[in-house]
Amino acid sequence: MKKKAIFGGTFNPIHNAHLNIAAKSIEKLQLDELIFVPSGNPPHKSEKGIAPAELRYEMVKEAIKDNCKFRIDDYEIKKKGISYTYETLEHFSRSQKDVDWFFIAGLDSLMDLDKWRNVNTILSLCKFIVFNRSGYNKSQVLEQKEYLEKKYINNIVFLDIKPIDISSTIIRQKIRENEYIGDLVPEKIYDIIKKNKLYV
C-alpha cells in the first residue's frame, strides 16, 4: 500500500518553511508522494489579503517542480464554495484506492481542530500529522491532544521537525514595508511576487 500525504494551506505565499516541512515529512514518514493542495475559499480565513488562487497555485507549482515526490492538486481551487478538510480527504480517498493517507498540519490546526467540521471523518480517513510551531506551550499542546483523542478517533501523530521561524504573515508584512524576502522564499517565488505586485 502506498503512503501519501496531503499538505493543505492557503500558501499565501509558499515559503522555505513549507518546503522544509514537506521534505522532512517525506523522509520521516517514508512517503511515496506528498500532495500540495492550495485552498480555494478556506472557511477559517477571510479573503482580504489572499492572493488570487491561480497565482498561489502557480507559486506552489514553481516551488515544488524539482522534487519528484512533490505534486500539486487544484481540487480545492476548482471546487465551488468553502473548502472543508473532510471533503478534500473524502475526494482523495475515493479517487485513489489502496492508499495510506496522512494529513500534514501545524500545531495551530491541532489547537483549533475541535472547531473543524466532521472531525471524526477526518481522523477516520487519515493519520493527522502535527508538526512543531513556535509560540505554543508544550503542556497545553499535550493536554489538547489527549482531549481530542478521548473525544474522537485516536489518529493524531506528532512529527518532530525543528521549525523554521517563517510565516506567510511575516512575509506579507515585510513586502508591505518594502523589506527583502529573498532569503525566506525560493527565488522563482520572489520573482512571481514582484512581477505581479502581490501583497503590496
Curated annotation (Swiss-Prot):
E.C. number: 2.7.7.18
Alphabetized GO MF terms: ATP binding; nicotinate-nucleotide adenylyltransferase activity
Top-rank taxon: Bacteria
Keyword Transferase part of the UniProt annotation: yes
Catalysed reaction, written as an equation: nicotinate beta-D-ribonucleotide + ATP + H(+) = deamido-NAD(+) + diphosphate
Keyword Nucleotide-binding: yes
Top class in the EC scheme: transferase
Pathway the protein takes part in: Cofactor biosynthesis; NAD(+) biosynthesis; deamido-NAD(+) from nicotinate D-ribonucleotide: step 1/1
CDD domains, per the entry: NMNAT
A Gene Ontology BP annotation from the UniProt entry: NAD biosynthetic process
Keywords linked to the UniProt accession: ATP-binding, NAD, Nucleotide-binding, Nucleotidyltransferase, Pyridine nucleotide biosynthesis, Transferase
HAMAP family in alphabetical order: NaMN_adenylyltr
Known role: Catalyzes the reversible adenylation of nicotinate mononucleotide (NaMN) to nicotinic acid adenine dinucleotide (NaAD).
Annotated family: Belongs to the NadD family.
Descriptive protein name: Probable nicotinate-nucleotide adenylyltransferase
